Design a protein with these regions (language model features):
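Residue-level signal for tight coil/turn positions that link beta-strands
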Residues: 8-10, 75-77, 146
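Low-complexity, intrinsically disordered Gly/Pro/Thr-rich segments
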Residues: 135-137, 145-154
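Pocket-edge structural micro-motifs
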Residues: 41, 83, 153
């Protein structure tokens, strides 16, 4: 499995990490906040062609803004997330990848079910609804910049960034 991820700027990553460190004790299985939005998850067997195709789609792409507008609980996957608006360059980039590779993307990123987000907490056994209430009170909408697109291979434990594209300003 290979993910195409939009990496947000350091200030936005710190803002989301600080939100997680609200003084509450989370019994969470979430590791350190990496600060990204998954655009697509490729499950095919031609990774090199997929990366080359995505690089081609990115050739005219510049840094762009995303607006984080809300905190949401996604119960089907036991995660609490910060969600950017599904619009603009973020949506256009997702749709371009999905149009070209729809048959080789997972069910969550290949079509209109795609829900852009940055995971804040993962805990299938915890009280995420209580955590959601706390984080919603402390959250204020903000704008982040996407400065880099990375290709991340999911491993047994963790992930490996196998390639990236730095977006020009």
């Amino acid at each position: 499995m290979l993910c195409v991820i939009a990496r947000i700027d350091p200030g936005a990553r710190e803002r989301l990490a600080a939100l997680r460190r609200t003084g509450e004790t989370w019994d969470s299985r979430t590791g350190e906040l990496y600060g990204h939005i998954t655009l697509a998850t490729y499950v095919g067997d031609a990774e090199d062609r997929f990366i080359a195709s995505c690089r081609e789609l990115l050739s005219g792409c510049r840094t762009f803004s995303v607006r984080y507008g809300r905190i949401e609980l996604l119960p089907a996957t036991s995660i609490l997330v910060a969600s950017p608006d599904k619009e603009g360059a973020l949506l256009a980039l997702h749709d371009a990848i999905a149009e070209k590779w729809s048959g080789a993307l997972d069910r969550w990123t290949g079509d209109e079910r795609w829900k852009p987000h940055t995971t804040l907490l993962y805990d299938p056994d915890g009280d995420l609804a209580a955590a959601e209430a706390v984080l919603r009170k402390k959250f204020s909408p903000f704008t982040a910049r996407v400065e880099r697109i990375e290709f991340s291979r999911v491993e047994e434990t963790g992930y490996t960034i196998v390639d990236h594209v730095d977006l020009p300003a």
